[in-house]
Regions:
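Compositionally biased alpha-helical segments
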Residues: 1-73, 77-270
């Protein structure tokens, strides 16, 4: 009887697509990169889902799928290890450059002129996150310190200030201080005449005291908080760490945006 031939023909027709699918899945291919391995694994998975047989064909596909998974895990681990090594190398280089910059910055500050330090920091580009944060913290600090002196000079030009100020040398002067627009010298009216001294000769602590006296006259809350922030950053840039911490602590309780900016200064270890 030829019934078996007809039956075999039906079976062949039924499994014929599996031959094609398996031949395609088992063909030699380039699978060296993560993308190539992922593509091959996807194709094998799709083949496994499509084949109808449950014997040797399926076993071959499942073995290939398992092998590709192992290879994918191995290559992924190698890539991660390579990436970590590259990141470590880059981080060490960034930290070394940051150390050089940090050592150089003080020499770029002349009196209360922070422009050179700001220019240097603005031009720096780092890939390491914590190093970039450290640079951002320093740039924020010096930029705010510059803005502090600008604001104080504007106040002195517009209003003047009366009280006792201390110079860096330790000499104290009591009188009314004023500043002419475009001038870098402070005019101090004292008993018996007027004394002219460079703005940069005043002790940082005295500058903050002068600025705070102007701040107490401010009624706008935004301006008030901004001035307090400038005072805190200037104090830190000038090396008055304790005063800076006190001013910043008070401000952080009331001003959340400042808190996030100040945290960069803290994280930078300034």
């Amino acid at each position: 009887s030829s019934d078996w031939v007809a039956l075999y023909s039906v079976l062949v027709d039924f499994y014929k697509p599996d031959f094609h699918l398996l031949r395609t899945a088992l063909k030699q291919r380039k699978v060296n990169t993560l993308d190539e391995l992922s593509a091959a694994l996807d194709e094998v998975r799709q083949t496994r889902e499509k084949i109808k047989s449950s014997g040797a064909f399926r076993t071959s596909i499942e073995q290939m799928e398992a092998g590709l998974k192992r290879e994918l895990a191995r290559v992924r681990l190698e890539e991660q290890t390579k990436q970590r090594r590259e990141e470590d190398t880059r981080r060490k280089a960034d930290l070394a450059q940051l150390a050089e910059v940090t050592a150089l910055l003080p020499s770029l500050v002349h009196g209360f002129d922070y422009s050179r330090a700001i220019d240097l920091l603005t031009g720096l580009r780092f890939e390491t996150t914590d190093v970039r944060t450290a640079v951002e913290g320093r740039l924020y600090l010096y930029s705010s310190a510059r803005d502090f002196t600008k604001q104080l000079q504007l106040d002195l030009i517009g209003k003047g200030w009366t009280g006792t100020l201390t110079q860096r040398s330790g000499v104290t002067l009591t009188g009314t201080a004023s500043l002419a627009a475009g001038s870098s010298d402070l005019q101090i009216k004292v008993e018996g005449g007027t004394i002219t001294i460079p703005f940069d000769s005043i002790a940082p602590q005295s500058l903050i005291e002068m600025a705070q006296s102007f701040t107490t006259q401010v009624t706008d809350s935004t301006d008030y908080y901004h001035r307090q922030e400038l005072a805190a950053t200037f104090a830190r840039a000038a090396g008055l760490d304790q005063l800076s911490t006190t001013l910043a602590a008070q401000l952080m309780e009331e001003n959340r945006p400042f808190r996030s900016r100040w945290m960069k200064v803290m994280e930078a270890g300034i």
